């Protein structure tokens, strides 16, 4: 039971980032690896601005993530730089930016106000459920509205969107800004739960996000072809929950933590290699 609760809590921390990656990876069809750095950016901005108040720090972090997404969009504009390369380049630069913000590799936020202390609760499960419920509603409204339709059109056929007289690059910017804003929000949640922001805390989260999206679709949407926003979001949750349950089980049975990423990498490789190319 403890394994499930721990996995559920970790999944809820990561879910905003997974939903953000879903928007970039599945909706826009852009493999945006920038979230590795944006995740740290959110935690860094939160840790530095928390003296101004909890909600101010959350807003500053999300805005910082959104700005980073718009910069990455500008780098990709009119095929100036390949999306994958743009993400790698952005991460390369973000390392210095995050260090400049933090002024040191690690910042403690212990003793600072958090969602847990504001709500006067004993564990993180309830605050995480509340904030994720709010985010899911927002993402559902987005995906079911005109903006969601145009974002999907961008991913399906950008040239068709241009032929219809729509500002395709604007939708790229909006999609990547929302995606990176959600990644930054996850960084703030992680900093609050763990009690610190660290310059290396984002290593590999983009790959975990892509793996969770694909695994969730294989488990829950394997034979479903029609787009259903609620089912897509639920599949993202199933995917990240499966990942953290697997992680908890491996630790519980005594697997050396040094080998965890190797084993989980093999699992992700098998999952990715078994998916049709058009579903990647």
Swiss-Prot record:
Transmembrane segments: 3-23, 52-72, 81-101, 123-143, 196-216, 233-253
GO molecular-function term, one example from the UniProt record: transmembrane transporter activity
InterPro entries per the UniProt record, alphabetical: ABC_transp_permease (IPR001851)
Topology versus the membrane: Multi-pass membrane protein
Pfam families referenced in this protein's UniProt entry, alphabetically: BPD_transp_2
Keywords: Cell membrane, Membrane, Transmembrane, Transmembrane helix
Compartmental location: Cell membrane
GO cellular component terms, A-Z: plasma membrane
PANTHER family linked to this entry: ABC TRANSPORTER PERMEASE PROTEIN YPHD-RELATED-RELATED (PTHR32196), BRANCHED-CHAIN AMINO ACID TRANSPORT SYSTEM, PERMEASE PROTEIN (PTHR32196:SF69)
Record's protein name: Uncharacterized protein RP368
Organism: Rickettsia prowazekii (strain Madrid E)
């Amino acid at each position: 039971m403890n394994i499930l609760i721990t996995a559920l809590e970790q999944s809820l921390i990561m879910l905003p980032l997974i939903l953000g990656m879903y928007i970039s990876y599945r909706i826009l069809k852009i493999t945006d690896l920038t979230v590795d750095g944006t995740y740290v950016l959110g935690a860094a901005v939160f840790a530095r601005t928390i003296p101004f108040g909890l909600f101010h720090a959350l807003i500053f972090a999300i805005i910082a993530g959104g700005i980073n997404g718009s910069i990455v969009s500008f780098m990709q504009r009119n095929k100036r730089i390949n999306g994958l390369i743009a993400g790698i380049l952005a991460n390369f630069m973000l390392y210095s930016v995050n260090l400049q913000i933090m002024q040191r590799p690690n910042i403690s936020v212990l003793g600072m106000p958090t969602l847990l202390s504001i709500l006067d609760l004993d564990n993180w499960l309830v605050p995480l459920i509340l904030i994720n419920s709010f985010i899911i509603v927002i993402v559902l409204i987005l995906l079911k509205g005109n903006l969601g339709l145009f974002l999907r059109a961008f991913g399906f056929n950008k040239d068709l969107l241009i032929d219809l007289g729509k500002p395709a690059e604007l939708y790229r910017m909006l999609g990547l800004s929302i995606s990176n804003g959600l990644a930054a929000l996850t960084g703030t949640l992680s900093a609050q739960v763990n009690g610190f922001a660290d310059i290396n805390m984002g290593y590999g989260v983009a790959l975990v996000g892509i793996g969770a999206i694909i695994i969730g679709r294989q488990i829950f949407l394997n034979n479903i072809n029609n787009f259903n926003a609620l089912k897509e979001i639920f599949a993202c949750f199933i995917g990240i929950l499966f990942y953290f349950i697997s992680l908890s089980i491996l630790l519980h049975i005594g697997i050396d933590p040094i080998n965890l990423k190797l084993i989980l990498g093999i699992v992700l490789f098998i999952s990715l290699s078994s998916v049709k190319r058009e579903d990647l």
